[in-house]
Amino acid sequence: MAEEHRCETPEGHRLCVNNCGFFGSSATMNLCSNCYGDLCLKQQQQASMKSTVESSLSPVIAPVLENYAAELEIPTTKKTEEKKPIQIPTEQPSPPQRPNRCTVCRKRVGLTGFMCRCGTTFCGSHRYPEVHGCTFDFKSAGREEIAKANPLVIAAKLQKI
Protein backbone atom coordinates (compact mmCIF):
# COMPACT_ATOMS: atom_id res chain seq x y z
CA MET A 1 0.00 0.00 0.00
CA ALA A 2 2.90 2.31 0.69
CA GLU A 3 4.04 1.72 -2.82
CA GLU A 4 0.72 2.91 -4.20
CA HIS A 5 0.89 6.22 -2.37
CA ARG A 6 4.52 6.88 -3.23
CA CYS A 7 5.14 10.28 -4.74
CA GLU A 8 5.70 9.82 -8.43
CA THR A 9 6.22 12.52 -11.01
CA PRO A 10 3.70 12.85 -13.78
CA GLU A 11 4.60 11.29 -17.11
CA GLY A 12 5.32 14.67 -18.82
CA HIS A 13 7.83 15.79 -16.21
CA ARG A 14 11.16 14.11 -15.57
CA LEU A 15 13.90 15.03 -13.17
CA CYS A 16 17.19 16.37 -14.54
CA VAL A 17 19.67 13.69 -15.59
CA ASN A 18 22.34 15.32 -13.40
CA ASN A 19 20.13 14.86 -10.31
CA CYS A 20 20.27 18.52 -9.43
CA GLY A 21 16.65 18.50 -8.24
CA PHE A 22 15.09 20.45 -11.09
CA PHE A 23 12.90 19.11 -13.87
CA GLY A 24 14.35 18.52 -17.32
CA SER A 25 12.68 18.42 -20.71
CA SER A 26 13.15 16.19 -23.72
CA ALA A 27 14.08 19.25 -25.83
CA THR A 28 17.14 19.80 -23.63
CA MET A 29 18.17 16.11 -23.45
CA ASN A 30 16.35 15.69 -20.11
CA LEU A 31 18.48 18.42 -18.52
CA CYS A 32 17.25 21.42 -16.58
CA SER A 33 17.92 24.90 -17.95
CA ASN A 34 20.97 25.43 -15.70
CA CYS A 35 22.65 22.15 -16.61
CA TYR A 36 21.80 22.57 -20.30
CA GLY A 37 23.38 26.06 -20.32
CA ASP A 38 26.54 24.67 -18.69
CA LEU A 39 26.66 21.86 -21.26
CA CYS A 40 26.32 24.30 -24.18
CA LEU A 41 29.06 26.52 -22.73
CA LYS A 42 31.44 23.55 -22.37
CA GLN A 43 30.76 22.47 -25.96
CA GLN A 44 31.49 25.98 -27.27
CA GLN A 45 34.75 26.15 -25.32
CA GLN A 46 35.83 22.75 -26.61
CA ALA A 47 35.01 23.75 -30.19
CA SER A 48 36.97 27.00 -29.89
CA MET A 49 39.95 25.20 -28.35
CA LYS A 50 39.85 22.60 -31.11
CA SER A 51 39.78 25.26 -33.84
CA THR A 52 42.69 27.19 -32.27
CA VAL A 53 44.75 24.02 -31.96
CA GLU A 54 44.04 23.10 -35.58
CA SER A 55 44.85 26.61 -36.81
CA SER A 56 48.10 26.72 -34.84
CA LEU A 57 49.18 23.29 -36.07
CA SER A 58 48.21 23.74 -39.71
CA PRO A 59 50.90 26.38 -40.56
CA VAL A 60 53.55 24.19 -38.95
CA ILE A 61 52.48 20.93 -40.55
CA ALA A 62 51.72 22.28 -44.04
CA PRO A 63 55.28 23.49 -44.87
CA VAL A 64 56.75 20.27 -43.51
CA LEU A 65 54.44 18.25 -45.74
CA GLU A 66 55.21 20.47 -48.74
CA ASN A 67 58.96 20.12 -48.18
CA TYR A 68 58.60 16.37 -47.81
CA ALA A 69 56.53 16.15 -51.01
CA ALA A 70 59.03 18.32 -52.86
CA GLU A 71 61.88 16.03 -51.80
CA LEU A 72 59.98 12.99 -53.03
CA GLU A 73 59.18 14.51 -56.43
CA ILE A 74 62.71 15.65 -57.22
CA PRO A 75 65.14 12.85 -57.96
CA THR A 76 68.56 12.80 -56.32
CA THR A 77 69.88 15.52 -58.66
CA LYS A 78 70.57 18.56 -56.54
CA LYS A 79 72.52 21.67 -57.29
CA THR A 80 75.55 22.19 -55.17
CA GLU A 81 75.68 25.63 -53.74
CA GLU A 82 78.94 27.46 -53.63
CA LYS A 83 79.83 28.36 -50.12
CA LYS A 84 80.75 31.98 -49.69
CA PRO A 85 83.62 32.67 -47.36
CA ILE A 86 82.55 34.15 -44.08
CA GLN A 87 83.75 37.69 -43.74
CA ILE A 88 85.02 38.56 -40.33
CA PRO A 89 84.27 42.19 -39.57
CA THR A 90 87.56 43.99 -39.27
CA GLU A 91 87.98 46.97 -37.05
CA GLN A 92 87.42 50.08 -39.06
CA PRO A 93 89.93 52.80 -38.44
CA SER A 94 88.49 55.43 -36.17
CA PRO A 95 87.90 58.82 -37.76
CA PRO A 96 90.85 61.16 -37.37
CA GLN A 97 90.70 62.92 -34.05
CA ARG A 98 90.48 66.67 -34.00
CA PRO A 99 93.47 68.37 -32.52
CA ASN A 100 92.49 69.53 -29.07
CA ARG A 101 95.03 72.36 -28.80
CA CYS A 102 95.24 75.79 -30.43
CA THR A 103 97.91 75.90 -33.16
CA VAL A 104 99.19 79.34 -32.10
CA CYS A 105 99.18 79.33 -28.28
CA ARG A 106 98.92 75.55 -27.62
CA LYS A 107 96.02 76.21 -25.27
CA ARG A 108 93.75 73.21 -24.75
CA VAL A 109 90.47 73.84 -26.61
CA GLY A 110 88.52 70.55 -26.49
CA LEU A 111 85.03 70.97 -27.94
CA THR A 112 85.23 74.78 -27.98
CA GLY A 113 87.94 74.84 -30.64
CA PHE A 114 87.34 76.52 -33.99
CA MET A 115 88.32 74.87 -37.27
CA CYS A 116 89.57 77.38 -39.80
CA ARG A 117 89.22 76.91 -43.54
CA CYS A 118 92.96 76.53 -43.73
CA GLY A 119 92.52 73.24 -41.81
CA THR A 120 93.89 74.06 -38.36
CA THR A 121 92.25 74.41 -34.94
CA PHE A 122 92.33 77.60 -32.91
CA CYS A 123 91.10 78.90 -29.57
CA GLY A 124 88.55 81.70 -29.21
CA SER A 125 91.12 84.50 -29.36
CA HIS A 126 93.05 83.15 -32.41
CA ARG A 127 90.07 82.00 -34.48
CA TYR A 128 90.00 85.06 -36.77
CA PRO A 129 92.09 84.85 -39.98
CA GLU A 130 93.76 88.21 -39.33
CA VAL A 131 94.99 87.10 -35.88
CA HIS A 132 96.55 83.76 -36.82
CA GLY A 133 97.87 84.78 -40.23
CA CYS A 134 95.66 82.50 -42.32
CA THR A 135 96.93 81.50 -45.76
CA PHE A 136 93.49 80.65 -47.16
CA ASP A 137 92.28 82.93 -50.00
CA PHE A 138 88.75 83.86 -48.98
CA LYS A 139 88.14 86.21 -51.96
CA SER A 140 88.77 83.60 -54.65
CA ALA A 141 86.79 80.98 -52.71
CA GLY A 142 83.85 83.40 -52.49
CA ARG A 143 84.04 84.16 -56.21
CA GLU A 144 84.01 80.45 -57.05
CA GLU A 145 80.98 79.83 -54.82
CA ILE A 146 79.07 82.71 -56.41
CA ALA A 147 79.95 81.44 -59.89
CA LYS A 148 78.67 77.96 -59.03
CA ALA A 149 75.48 79.30 -57.46
CA ASN A 150 74.73 81.71 -60.34
CA PRO A 151 75.67 80.15 -63.68
CA LEU A 152 76.03 82.53 -66.61
CA VAL A 153 72.97 82.48 -68.84
CA ILE A 154 73.53 83.38 -72.49
CA ALA A 155 70.43 83.81 -74.59
CA ALA A 156 70.34 82.64 -78.18
CA LYS A 157 70.68 85.41 -80.74
CA LEU A 158 67.53 86.53 -82.46
CA GLN A 159 67.59 86.69 -86.20
CA LYS A 160 66.61 90.00 -87.69
CA ILE A 161 63.79 89.99 -90.16
From Swiss-Prot:
Binding residues for Zn(2+) 2: C102, C105, C123, H126
SUPFAM superfamilies assigned: AN1-like Zinc finger, Glucocorticoid receptor-like (DNA-binding domain)
Zinc finger (AN1-type): 96-142
UniProt zinc finger (A20-type) residues: 10-44
Gene3D superfamilies, A to Z: 1.20.5.4770, AN1-like Zinc finger
Species annotation: Arabidopsis thaliana
Keyword Metal-binding: yes
Binding site for Zn(2+) 1: C16, C20, C32, C35
One Pfam family named in its UniProt record: zf-AN1
GO MF annotation terms: DNA binding; zinc ion binding
Record has Metal-binding as a keyword: yes
Protein name as it appears in the record: Zinc finger A20 and AN1 domain-containing stress-associated protein 4
PROSITE patterns associated with the record: ZF_A20, ZF_AN1
This protein's UniProt keywords: Metal-binding, Zinc, Zinc-finger
Residues binding Zn(2+) 3: C116, C118, H132, C134
InterPro entries reported for this sequence: AN1-like_Znf, AN1_A20_ZnFinger, Znf_A20, Znf_AN1
Residue span of region Disordered: 76-99
Highest taxon above the source species: Eukaryota
